[in-house]
Amino acid sequence: MSNVPLATKTIRKLSNRKYEIKIYLKDENTCFERVVDMVVPLYDVCNETSGVTLESCSPNIEVIELDNTHVRIKVHGDTLKEMCFELLFPCNVNEAQVWKYVSRLLLDNVSHNDVKYKLANFRLTLNGKHLKLKEIDQPLFIYFVDDLGNYGLITKENIQNNNLQVNKDASFITIFPQYAYICLGRKVYLNEKVTFDVTTDATNITLDFNKSVNIAVSFLDIYYEVNNNEQKDLLKDLLKRYGEFEVYNADTGLIYAKNLSIKNYDTVIQVERLPVNLKVRAYTKDENGRNLCLMKITSSTEVDPEYVTSNNALLGTLRVYKKFDKSHLKIVMHNRGSGNVFPLRSLYLELSNVKGYPVKASDTSRLDVGIYKLNKIYVDNDENKIILEEIEAEYRCGRQVFHERVKLNKHQCKYTPKCPFQFVVNSPDTTIHLYGISNVCLKPKVPKNLRLWGWILDCDTSRFIKHMADGSDDLDLDVRLNRNDICLKQAIKQHYTNVIILEYANTYPNCTLSLGNNRFNNVFDMNDNKTISEYTNFTKSRQDLNNMSCILGINIGNSVNISSLPGWVTPHEAKILRSGCARVREFCKSFCDLSNKRFYAMARDLVSLLFMCNYVNIEINEAVCEYPGYVILFARAIKVINDLLLINGVDNLAGYSISLPIHYGSTEKTLPNEKYGGVDKKFKYLFLKNKLKDLMRDADFVQPPLYISTYFRTLLDAPPTDNYEKYLVDSSVQSQDVLQGLLNTCNTIDTNARVASSVIGYVYEPCGTSEHKIGSEALCKMAKEASRLGNLGLVNRINESNYNKCNKYGYRGVYENNKLKTKYYREIFDCNPNNNNELISRYGYRIMDLHKIGEIFANYDESESPCERRCHYLEDRGLLYGPEYVHHRYQESCTPNTFGNNTNCVTRNGEQHVYENSCGDNATCGRRTGYGRRSRDEWNDYRKPHVYDNCADANSSSSDSCSDSSSSSESESDSDGCCDTDASLDSDIENCYQNPSKCDAGC
């Protein structure tokens, strides 16, 4: 914006060298652009050191000095029509000298390159009578626009010197209606739009000024469209205190008066002449002149202007509407120790409304429209040990975002603002941000003494699976093979089972899901003519199981290759998942974005699965072991989904676990050898070599919140031993370095408490014999060993053959001579089943959640481009600036051939995929070396994080482990050790506060 028609509103002296100046656009139908390049001329054109400093007086305006006479102004808003600056002169100046300098400033900013001076003869009249220039004792700035769209300026100097500066290619100029100056307290206007030819040698210009006419205006009536007197009184109070209006000409758009209070019944304004057509625009503003948008106000003059012929005028009827019923309040805590953001429900705010009446509010409270003053904040420090430092609120009016932020004083468990703090409630959702230090760890922890034991069911062959008449599947909790058999309901009630996992689930690119051979549609893709019941696979049985404290899970990813797993990564992207932590991190953060159509489908599919169960188990089978970055991809996907759900009020989050293949130890030893046994060798080597365990400590990724379920291949290659049960359980908790990295734990005890063993019943026969076949005795022995090691439990693939049916004796133990030889299965674990309630309540969605989640996802499923769709979604919630700015940056980030040397941009199926080749010599994990797609960290500069974090273990510290196996030729890693594996996680609050960069726990 180089050709700017500026006008001066006020000039106020601050000191002998400093003056405050308010400028606005002379053409009141326009607004300032987001970036304005402005000329600030030298005070003395002959002295290069006489520069004038321009400083902003508003937080929405940023001034960047380009050189001695040019500045760049960045405007944070779309409807800004007025700017306030401070001018710092190099010497002492008086007001006359300031006005003279301002004349040069305005003229320099309206000038452009291709200009010429024309001879012009000016004639001035006031109300039809000749006016001498010397009778105008004020600065005179008359703007015009030429036929090319360039603005020009007529000053006193132009009139005195009979010249005019215009574009050399212009044919004519138009002087539009505008305010000119003040004469004896009366405003003087140019009323008519007049055009003059500038192609001749000399141009004759007549400026016909008109002195204003005073008229008294008032409203005919104010009508409040609300249902009850309480709401009517509320709107009356708000309108009386904050209601303002402006009056303008319906024909020319010329504004006669601004910021007039609605509470004043009779107001005198000045118009250029009578008769005149008047229009009214009403709004709400605060004491600082900021728009509030508290209500919708319409005037009858907007459609039918008032025709005024006398010195008294009625301005029609105002109608006042509420834009919403009540606003839902959200209170979120920003932990400066770890960077985590989470809802805070253990405090309440003591507020005062517009009438001064006290109001108490907490998270999820509902507030009426208005402005609320904060008096105190009460915190339950026994439940959540937090230290608050600042409070921030923001509200939107149109495309403008206004912020209020103050520091807090602490008095025991009570906080008060250091200076008056108010926040505006003018939308259906209001968010209050609190900043401080907290040791509230939001990592989904396993409840104390939790034990899981149960079965993994084959969805195709299990007798416990039944097909409903409407096409859906469900569990049959009452089925039994014979009178000695035990049904699932009885097993659960008697505490022999408290977890059931359905196997062989999968997702497909066409938005369909499957459990075994049965395919069904994504629950969000229901046709209008179908009911929700047709998509409620396992939802009824899940409710029955949850009522009995039993968890239902779904196992996804078994017996498929990498390209068939959720997310449908391409072969090229799969290679990235073999790489070092920097490339894996960058890829996961760019892929897991709802603007990515494949991830958008993946997220909807995962939520559809979670509608049927409590959590999803992701199985890393042999085909995926060479791609350990897939674990990181899934951890990032869950984080993005949980962020989106939590900030939109859905407390039931996405839970998951991981299954890994297990190798057995050396045949030379009875117990597994650490060098050979444990987690699959390829997975372990690449996971440790590429330092992926460090990413699982990052707040941008969610560690498995439930447990890791390990499974075994076969015992045909197992070494001979007298205690296979102990051997198998020991194998499941080997590779502590890998397991601690996945689970973000720091010791063997915490790790074992998160590991559940599983065994496939029909292969539990070493060397093809039935000596150690699966049975009640073997299960009890394994349960005893698992309990000794402090494991989470046993979740076994059930063998439902007639030979090995699960009868009641198989569940309870082994009888010999009518005496129980082995302890009860459930007594070995000695677990209170109510410990599952926390997991049940946290994970898995209900019908009411599903509809809300569907609305959340629907915001991304429109005809807009992915970037614009996401930006508008965030913008509606006040989390981002206007979408045009971000759309511009998004286009830059996806422009080919604009990346650094270490960055590639690949186009696939019409989509841009950006990744980096390496961290670079000095890179740290997650640092970018090129100018590719904007990472999630960079987005945080432009929006508030929305927000659920799984912070790291409070006292965990992990040391690097090196595998002695050799890597494959295709594997890639970061040689510079891009992730800091030696960073300790301090649980002390003060250390978190003093050293936030080293604290990743938030404790």
Swiss-Prot record:
Cellular component GO terms, alphabetical: viral occlusion body
Region (Disordered): 953-979
Residues bearing PTM N-acetylserine: S2
Keyword Disulfide bond applies: yes
One of the Pfam families matching this protein, by short name: Spheroidin
UniProtKB keywords: Acetylation, Disulfide bond, Late protein, Viral occlusion body
InterPro entries: Spheroidin
Ranges of compositional bias, category Low complexity: 953-970
Complex formation: May form disulfide-bond-linked aggregates.
Function field: Major component of viral occlusion bodies, the protective complexes in which the virions are embedded in the cytoplasm of their insect hosts.
Name this polypeptide is given: Spheroidin
Originating species: Amsacta moorei entomopoxvirus
